[in-house]
């Protein structure tokens, strides 16, 4: 028995905007009389939009109206109605997520993503999505090799170190193809603030490839430091993206470097330096000539589309099948996660008092709990929440806990208990209507840079 979910991935980046429509096949992987175990078994891409330049009113403001028209047109071309989309992700990435009107863009696009809306991708989430979408995670799992994936976009480079098919750590550097822009004659039109002290060019200067190359070399050196191929200097910290943790340089002796993002296409083939009106072509060729490509390296199976495929196909999870829900107004969108250090009514009250609206309480739970353990948890949660309980567990006990809460809070209370979903502090959840016995869930990290 299988179900089909229609999914959309929309990536609004510093340089480009693109969409992917895909179908996710959901199947029960359990056998016989076992508890149902629902998994996303297959991902089929049904439509790819062209890659568009992200519409901007100026260097600081995304044109939300033009972006909405672009998205509506792609839905029309794909032959897909908004109401037929079940799941997916709108990801605002790179420098675009720090534009002053990022929230307005989200508002303008929110009704295009079916039952799911993902806001801005923090550096960690964007790195994970890019590594998965580019095939770097699959490559590591298939070959057993350790991979450092670099998704080099317009404003930032998202890093992910992958060992045996598992992402160990992530990072983000202010290295990208649109940090320096030119008109058709080579006159500088924009210099990103992150290049302060690193670039001798300023808007209005007439530039040549020879003047641009040193800037590309500096950016490439930061990537080499992250890969452990160059001795670390303060440059690495200087170019670390605000909001991203420090990425300790790799120490692996055998490391495959994988590339995706718009600049990755410029690594593979040499293009005229003003092809895109930015530093991208020169940066790509500088990387190609650097230590990053001196050993084993590979271009992702998807380069410029890596993040959006990750959003459309990899952000959706399914809860366990023994869930409990009562009077829940599905879909729930952008509900903050509060990780509990202990399950006491005092802690629950204190943590919920910090929230402006509803929050999902997350804790590991107990493996194969007895009746008394479940009852004790339910007593504390019922007393702490005061009538509305949204719970996320790692252990398979959501149904038992939900039933115990319903006995204490009554038939009119809003109760949601899901399990088999791993979250962390600072995450947000979207929870959709039931698919068979499980619930579709999107775990998100929302960070709007200042």
Which residue stretches match the model-derived regions?
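Glycine-rich phosphate-binding loop and adjoining helix at the ATP-binding site
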Residues: 94-130, 276-287
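Short acidic, glycine/serine/threonine-rich loops at helix termini
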Residues: 21-22, 31, 100-104, 129-133, ...
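Active-site nucleophile and cofactor-binding loops and adjacent substrate-binding regions
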Residues: 119-128, 151-152, 299-304, 395
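Short beta-strand segments
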Residues: 11, 91, 150-151, 258-260, ...
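Gly/Thr-rich phosphate-binding beta-strand-loop-beta motif of the actin/hexokinase/Hsp70
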Residues: 1-37, 136-174, 448-450
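Short beta-strand-loop/turn "lid" adjacent to the catalytic site in phosphate-handling enzymes
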Residues: 56, 75-108, 256-272
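Helical "lid/coupling" subdomains associated with nucleotide-phosphate turnover
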Residues: 21, 46-72, 180-450
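Conserved phosphate-binding catalytic cores of ATP/NTP-utilizing and phosphoryl-transfer enzymes
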Residues: 1-2, 115-147, 237-247, 307
């Amino acid at each position: 028995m299988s179900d089909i979910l229609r999914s959309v991935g929309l990536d609004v980046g510093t340089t480009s905007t693109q969409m992917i429509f895909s179908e996710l096949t959901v199947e029960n992987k359990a056998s016989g009389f076992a508890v149902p175990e629902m998994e996303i078994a297959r991902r089929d891409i049904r439509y790819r939009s062209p890659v568009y330049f992200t519409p901007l009113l100026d260097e600081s403001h995304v044109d939300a109206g033009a972006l909405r028209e672009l998205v509506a047109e792609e839905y029309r071309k794909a032959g897909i109605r908004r109401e037929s989309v079940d799941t997916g992700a709108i990801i605002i990435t790179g420098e675009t997520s720090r534009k002053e009107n990022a929230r307005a863009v989200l508002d303008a696009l929110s009704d295009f993503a079916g039952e799911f809306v993902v806001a801005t991708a923090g550096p960690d989430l964007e790195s994970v999505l890019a590594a998965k979408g580019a095939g770097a995670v699959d490559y590591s799992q298939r070959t057993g090799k350790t991979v450092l994936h670099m998704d080099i976009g317009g404003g930032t480079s998202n890093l992910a170190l992958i060992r045996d098919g598992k992402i160990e750590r992530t990072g983000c550097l202010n290295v990208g193809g649109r940090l320096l822009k030119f008109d058709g004659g080579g006159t500088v039109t924009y210099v990103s603030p992150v290049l302060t002290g690193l670039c001798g060019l300023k808007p209005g200067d007439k530039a040549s490839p020879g003047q641009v190359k040193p800037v590309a070399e500096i950016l490439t050196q930061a990537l080499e430091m992250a890969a452990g191929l160059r001795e670390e200097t303060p440059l690495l910290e200087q170019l670390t993206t605000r909001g991203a943790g420090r990425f300790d340089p790799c120490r692996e002796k055998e490391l495959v470097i994988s590339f995706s993002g718009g600049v990755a296409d410029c690594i593979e083939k040499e293009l005229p330096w003003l092809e895109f009106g930015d530093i991208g072509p020169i940066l790509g060729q500088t990387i190609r000539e650097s230590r990053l490509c001196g050993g084993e390296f590979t271009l992702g199976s998807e380069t410029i589309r890596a993040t959006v495929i990750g959003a459309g196909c990899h952000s959706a999870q399914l809860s366990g099948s023994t869930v409990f829900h009562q009077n829940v107004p599905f879909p729930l969108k952008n509900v903050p996660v509060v990780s509990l250090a202990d399950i006491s009514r005092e802690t629950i009250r204190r943590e919920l008092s910090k929230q402006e609206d509803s929050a999902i309480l997350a804790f590991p739970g107990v493996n194969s709990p007895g009746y008394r353990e479940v009852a004790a948890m339910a007593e504390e949660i019922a007393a702490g929440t005061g009538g509305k309980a949204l719970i996320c567990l790692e252990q398979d006990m959501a149904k038992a806990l939900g039933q115990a809460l319903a006995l204490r809070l009554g038939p009119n209370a809003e109760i949601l208990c899901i399990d088999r979903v791993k979250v962390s502090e600072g995450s947000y959840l979207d929870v959709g209507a039931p698919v068979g016995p499980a619930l579709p869930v999107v775990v998100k990290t929302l960070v709007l840079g200042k």
